[in-house]
Structure formats: C-alpha cells, structure tokens
Curated annotation (Swiss-Prot):
It is found in: Periplasm; Bacterial flagellum basal body. GO terms for biological process: bacterial-type flagellum-dependent cell motility. The keyword Cytoplasm does not apply. This is Flagellar P-ring protein. The basal body constitutes a major portion of the flagellar organelle and consists of four rings (L,P,S, and M) mounted on a central rod. Residues 1-30 form the signal peptide. Belongs to the FlgI family.
Length: 373
C-alpha cells in the first residue's frame, strides 16, 4: 500500500485532501480524533499577578499590605508621602489577577482575566484594575492587565449592622482585560512526529486510533506508544504540517467503550452507573433502625417554709423502631436496568443505595469499579 501523504514541499496537497474528504464519512458511533485527543505540546498556560483595584465606593480596605502596595505605586509615579503618613484607602483593594493564555497566542492579542480580592474588601463593584503584570511559572511577564471590572455580586449593609450579600461581590472579570506581550515557544513545528494524547487513557482506543491513521495515511505512519499517546509521522516543513494535522485530526474511528464504573457522590447523593456494570449472583436485604430519645423533666417542689430546694430530675424515654427490610436477589448477568428496577421496588433512598453498592462491592458481586467522590 502506498503512502497517501507526500512529504515533498514541491507537491501540492490536493490528492491527500480529496482522500481525506472521501474517507471522512463515518458511522453514527464514530468519533473524530480531535474530539477524543489533543496534540502534545499544544496547551494553554496559567498566568497570575498581584495588583490594585481603585475607584471603589468605600468598599475597599486599609490593610498593611494594601497600604504598602499603594505607597509603592505612588512612588513609581514620583509621589513621596511624608514619613508616618497613613493614607485612607477605603476606595482601594488588593487583588489577585488570573488568566489563561491559549496556545499560539500572539503579541497584541487579548485574553479575559479574573480579579479576586485578597484582603477585607467588601465589594469590587465599580472598581478599576490598575496595570498588573501577569507572570507564568517561569517568572516572566506574558501579559499586562488593566480595565474596568464587571461584578455580578452585590453587598449592602444597614445602619443597624444588617447585611445582604448576593452572589460574590469580591470577584469580578474583565473581558479582554489583558494584552499578550510575550509568546510562549511551541514545539509544534519541531521533530519528525506529532503526538496525540487521548483525553481518557485506554489501550484499545489508542490502538484503534493508530490503525485508523494508518488506513488513512499508509502503513507504519502511526503507532500507539501507550494507553494515552499515539505518535504520527509528520512532514518537517511547517507549511505542510498545518494542513497535514487538519486532515489527520478529522479522521473518524470507533473509540473503545469505557470500563464499567459506578460513580457515587457521597455529599450530594448522586449515583451514576455505567452501562457495562453487571452484578454477580447475590441476595441483599436492607433495613433501618430508628432510635428516638425523649427527655421529660420531673420537677420536685419542696413544701412551704421548708429548707428544701427545688430539684429538676430528667426522665429519659428511649424508643427503638426497626423497619423490616425486604430481600431481593440478583441473578447472574444483572444489568443496569435490572439493578435500578430492583432498588426502586424496595423503595430504597439514595443513601440506602450507596450502602447497598458498597456492601455488594465488598462481597465481590459488582463487575466494575465503585468510585466514591
């Protein structure tokens, strides 16, 4: 089988792109490579900075680090306060500014920023973020943020101390509030290979993806490195690499079904059961015991003109009620529908179902993973 992709820069890409369009027709259960994997090295980067928000209507703060930051800012503008002077900065707040720098961001482009108070400011509504340097993990400045905040929350305090707070007034956003000043180097144009990393690791999916790329480009063009990574040979010329990647990431293939899992959120009572979960033969009974303790206070009153004292004696009444639990039996190969139907028949609450699932897992009756989050 001949290679469908030409690595000669003097040849055009019409043939391979036509082949890509012809092979893009897929079944309803197929997925594109771009939907289940991402290109290694093509990633976003987190930025963070410390700054000041000014213009607050008395909802700012006057903490030591805010005053220090405010004085340092004035010194940068050539303003020197007299020694011992403590400015009243109730219209200023110290904030942390965060942003996400998308891959391939260029100088002059803008990104959104999130501004959050780090002191005792009551609200950032109506404030303006002053020029703040956003740095990466390497300590270099990649963007500069500044602008008016949009705050969805609100806060109001009455003269008697009563207070009403809606949403979160100490966090705001600035759309396009940071301008990119430095580009992050990308390994996209280097090397002879492009590596795709699956969003969910699976050996079968990785092998099927490599086979689909080989069927599209030719034999030995792609190989599964492990359960996450698939390496694809790519043109060295950067002008061909973009078109090459555009064709490859739109190749359709059938990912493997996920492993059998039961996800239990113990805080909210949410239970999600995968379609491949099955149960081995088991019998389950689940009952409840209610203990009610009622305190009755008995008062002993001494007679008139006596030296006795009034004594209060507690009288406890304990009542135990045990509900009769129903027993239900799981036959071999029980599916999700059967499990839900059986639990509903006994009227089990979500908390009861969690206890049942944990007991079944301990008994080895669940074919799958039980994950409690």
């Amino acid at each position: 089988m001949t290679n469908r992709w030409s690595f000669d820069v003097n040849k055009n890409l019409v043939t391979v792109l036509f082949t890509w369009l012809c092979l893009s027709i897929s079944t309803a259960h197929a997925a594109r490579i771009k939907d289940v994997a991402e290109v290694a090295g093509v990633r976003s980067n987190q930025l963070i900075g410390y700054g000041l928000v000014s213009g607050l209507p008395g909802t700012g703060e006057s903490t030591p680090f805010t005053d220090q930051s405010f004085n340092a800012m004035l010194q940068n503008f050539g303003i020197q306060l007299p020694p011992g002077t403590k400015p009243k900065t109730k219209n200023v707040a110290a904030v942390m500014v965060t942003a996400t720098l998308p891959p391939f961001s260029k100088q002059g482009q803008v990104v959104d920023v999130t501004v959050s108070s780090v002191g005792s400011a009551k609200s950032l509504r109506g404030g303006t973020l002053l020029q703040t340097f956003l740095k990466g993990l390497d300590g270099k400045t990649y963007a500069i943020a500044q602008g008016n905040l949009i705050v969805s929350g609100f806060s109001a305090t009455g003269a008697d101390g009563s207070k009403i707070v809606g949403n979160n007034p100490t966090v705001g956003r600035i759309s396009g509030g940071a301008m990119v000043e430095r580009e992050v180097p990308s390994p996209f144009g280097r090397g002879d290979f492009i590596t795709f990393n699956l969003l969910e690791s699976d050996f079968t999916t990785a092998q099927r993806m490599a086979d689909a790329v080989n069927n599209f480009l030719g034999p030995n063009m792609a190989s599964a490195v492990d359960a996450t990574s698939v390496r694809v040979r790519a043109p060295r010329d950067i002008s061909q690499r973009v078109a090459f990647l555009s064709a490859v990431e739109n190749v359709d293939f059938d990912p493997a079904d996920g492993s059998a899992k039961i996800i239990v959120n113990s805080r909210t009572g949410t239970i999600v059961v995968g379609k491949h979960v099955k149960l081995k033969p088991a019998a389950v009974t689940h009952g409840g015991m209610t203990v009610a303790i009622k305190e009755n206070l008995q008062v002993s009153q001494p007679g008139p003109f006596s030296d006795g004292q009034t004594v209060v004696t507690p009288d406890s009444d304990i009542e135990v009620t045990e509900e009769q639990g129903k027993m239900f039996k799981f036959e071999p190969g029980l599916t999700l529908d059967d499990l839900v139907r059986a639990v509903n028949e006994v009227g089990a609450a979500p908390s009861d179902l969690m206890a049942i699932l944990q007991a079944l897992k301990q008994a080895g009756a669940i074919e799958g993973q039980l994950i409690i989050i």
